[in-house]
Amino acid sequence: ISGRIRLEELHYAAQHNEYEEADDVYQSFGDVAKEEGFMEVASAFYQIAKIEKIHGDRFGKLAELLKTGAYFECQEGEKWMCLNCGHIHSGLKVPGVCPVCRHERGYFIPVSLAPYLMECE
């Protein structure tokens, strides 16, 4: 797509930023707090650094899934949820558009990744 940033590129950029926060920002905050004798504060910053690393890992995984096209396909039957209207679609692939609200396939996520997991029939 000429002149447009691809979604996976944004996720790779987000991964980079999360790793930077983990390795530089919160790690250094923790080091300063530790040097100044604030051990509890230092511990909190070190824990936040670990969380930021996990965020980076997740952005990277999502970028790879988008890049390969695997995000919108699966080997076994999957249930997909439209984040706009809540429609649940069953199948190996996400439809091009939601049959209910007509939003693009990018609004679908696997039900297993939905913010509030509910039993689907």
Q: Which residues does each predicted region cover?
A:
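Non-heme di-metal
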Residues: 1-121
